[in-house]
Amino acid sequence: MSYSRGGTLVTLLLLLVVASSLALTANANSFESLLQLPRRQSRSTRPRSERLLHVGNFGAKGNGVTDDTKAFADAWKTACSSKVKTRILVPENYTCLLRPIDLSGPCKARLTLQISGTIIAPNDPDVWEGLNRRKWLYFHGLSRLTVEGGGTVNGMGQEWWERSCKHNHSNPCRGAPTALTFHKCKNMRVENLNVIDSQQMHIALTSCRRVTISGLKVIAPATSPNTDGIHISVSRGIVIDNTTVSTGDDCISIVKNSTQISISNIICGPGHGISIGSLGKSKSWEEVRDITVDTAIISDTANGVRIKTWQGGSGLVSKIIFRNIKMNNVSNPIIIDQYYCDSRKPCANQTSAISIENISFVHVRGTSASKEAIKISCSDSSPCRNILLQDIDLEPSNGDGFTESFCWEAYGSSSGQVYPPPCLSDDTSFLEQSVQSGITSAYL
């Protein structure tokens, strides 16, 4: 009897425990529904962080011979219409031959073009017959684009260079494609790429905002004409960092109506150096301001850090800093040239000029291949103002003789050791001259 009572008691206790547990579960479910706690999603319903599109799945052969343009365009169209972040992959073992192509937006979500392999252009300029000769890979109207991958973009420019009027003066001067053009793009990154042998310019930013370029190698022969490395126009908020440029023209060029540009940790050369300009051609109005070039090694170039403007233009170049620049066997290491003339015929003298002011050259050291290591040649009608030379040491490349400075209508100051000796007129004399000129003109 006692065993039966004990068993009954145990059974009752078990029933109470089960009932309590069910009640707690019900209460918990009720509480959870009130707070709308997040539930775990199954693998099939959980959104993926990024969609991957392999160009091979769109028909690309990647053998360097078959035309992969349509496959690439189809992949781009799919990626651009995707509502989730998407990555287009050109894998390491692919060489995609692409004809001129527009890769335009706007796209619905973030898009990454990962070039781990190689993209090549047709090597025959006649492919561009009837097309825009200035374009090859043309990115337009995009936001939040990233182009990366460690691979190579090859413009196959040899035949273009041979047909250039700069190589053969009997040929007409005709435009040639830029390898990578980014037009009206914003919040964009271009990083970890090799861009080589472009038909003309390698990378152009036009009307862009907030762009970061880093980890690039831009390479073409020193004899290749007009093959600027990175060309910036009508753009603002541009950062270029940790990049090597070796081409036949400017390593980096900044032209009309560009501002807020930071350039750092650059290896440049051979080529034509780092340039602002040319500006003011055909009497145009142009402005470039708030530019900093900090930490660069420039070697075996036709110029070092340069500002170049045509006579007859108007506008302003202001708030430019060139700092921590190492020169190795560079002609014209420091140059401002307001008489720039890239023409077969001599340029006529003009009475107007772009104003140049608030320009600093700080801690520029190394060797000059030209006797004139500092050349600041400014306009009679619009002299350069507030030029600073600070801690400059530019010795002859051959170790013999000395270097010189040349100044014309250049006003400013120097500080620290400056060699060759500075030739700037002080700003006080400029003001006195301006006042005197005003008094004289008042009596005429």
Swiss-Prot record:
Record: active site: D249 (proton donor), H272
GO biological process: carbohydrate metabolic process; cell wall organization
Primary location group: secreted
Tissue expression pattern: Expressed in young, mature and dehiscing anthers. Found in stems, but not in roots or in abscission zone of floral organs.
Catalytic activity as recorded in UniProt: (1,4-alpha-D-galacturonosyl)n+m + H2O = (1,4-alpha-D-galacturonosyl)n + (1,4-alpha-D-galacturonosyl)m
PbH1 repeats: from-to residues: 208-234, 235-256, 258-278, 288-309, 317-338, 351-378
EC number: 3.2.1.15
Enzyme class (EC, first level): hydrolase
Signal peptide coordinates: 1-28
Locations listed in the record: Secreted, Cell wall
Similarity comment text for this entry: Belongs to the glycosyl hydrolase 28 family.
Protein name per UniProt: Probable polygalacturonase At1g80170
